[in-house]
Amino acid sequence: MNFVAFERAKQGTGASRRLRNSGKTPGIVYGGSAEPQLIEVDHNALWHALKKEAFHSSVLDMELAGKTSKVLLRDVQYHPYKQLVLHIDFQRVDEKTKLHMKVPLHFTGAEESPAVKIDKCMVNPVATELDVSCMPSDLPEFINVDLSKLEKGRSLHLKDIKLPRGVSPVVRGGQQNPVLVSVVPPVAEVEAPAEGAAAPAPAPAKKGKK
């Protein structure tokens, strides 16, 4: 994906407020050997771009001052209750250096799995994204996870999925093989009393006062 940015000279609260009032969003680009660069982006174009999953998880082409450079979206600040982007951060990408990025997981085939189709279980995604390490050219927009063979009583772990070529998982917290998807059994129906079973004895009637 690509987007257009413009150089921004002024900074500070007042300058940023005036910029937002004119339909622009202040931002910054940092990283690499170059100095941090103040930028501004058209708010409407940015707002629509942020609705796309790929804008958050892909290497982006940023057009700035007649040049195109590779960047990653690193931070977005939203207004608490208005549909307004207050500030945005991008990081420059070195094509020869590995990067760390969270990539969305796309789950497919759950309805065809024995767990769902036969045993009427529910599939519960424990994780919706995966932290990975790879070269910029190998960064996938998403990772497809096939659930068609998932069975009742089984969970899908990190080592059960096939990652794209050149992509390695980044595991933190001591869990080398975390659960990505769990299977939830169906809620057991309340069993009706067997036909012919003795009915419970009625409670004794209370005696009235004399």
UniProtKB/Swiss-Prot annotation:
One of its GO terms (molecular function) is 5S rRNA binding. Residues 191-200 have a biased composition (Low complexity). CDD domains: Ribosomal_L25_TL5_CTC. Residues 191-210 are annotated as: Disordered. One of its GO terms (cellular component) is cytosolic large ribosomal subunit. Keywords: Ribonucleoprotein, Ribosomal protein, RNA-binding, rRNA-binding. One of its GO terms (biological process) is translation. HAMAP family: Ribosomal_bL25, Ribosomal_bL25_CTC. Part of the 50S ribosomal subunit; part of the 5S rRNA/L5/L18/L25 subcomplex. Contacts the 5S rRNA. Binds to the 5S rRNA independently of L5 and L18. Belongs to the bacterial ribosomal protein bL25 family. CTC subfamily. This is one of the proteins that binds to the 5S RNA in the ribosome where it forms part of the central protuberance. This is Large ribosomal subunit protein bL25. It comes from Paracidovorax citrulli (strain AAC00-1) (Acidovorax citrulli). The gene is rplY.
